[in-house]
Amino acid sequence: TGFLGTDAFQEVDLVGITQPIAKWSYQIRRAEDVAWAIARAFYIASSGRPGPVVLDFAKNAQVEKTKYEPTKQEFIRSYVPVPDTDEESVKAAAELINNAERPLVLVGQGVELGSAQEELRIFIEKADMPAGCTLLGLSALPTDHPLNKGMLGMHGNLGPNINTNKCDVLIAVGMRFDDRVTGNLATYAKQAKVIHF
């Protein structure tokens, strides 16, 4: 680690490069930090919305010997993987849904990652709302379900794409409004109130 920051041969600021695209980037400089850093990396990568983490092992950490102490990460101060629910926002969303004349539910992979397929089915059936799925959300709702209108987006079905521009309330569940789904944001669902879970 004595050469870090000296522009040494093949030195790359991997942490600096990857911070904008990873949930957490960290450089391990001592072998004794490997166990807790790996535990923290797995915790962060798999909590909230899953995403990549980066661990950069300095040469010291690779060659030093240390006693391995298994560790488990269950909490990180100031890290909030899932924000608290705002009760007023939930009430406002429920009112929009209850008063909607032409609602549409957009289903993404987050439903599957959260193992919420059954809750989704109950929700759309109880409210009698049609649903369209993103490519990665296709298996969240059976294709033969009467409220499943098919895949959304530029490679999707005509029906749900037309419905996004006719609905009065758009409920997005477990999806991120990727450009493959929305296309031109200037014209996408401008008439709708949007609820994003």
Regions from the PLM with identified roles:
Residues T1-F197:
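N-terminal alpha/beta PP-like core and its mobile active-site loop of ThDP/TPP-dependent enzymes
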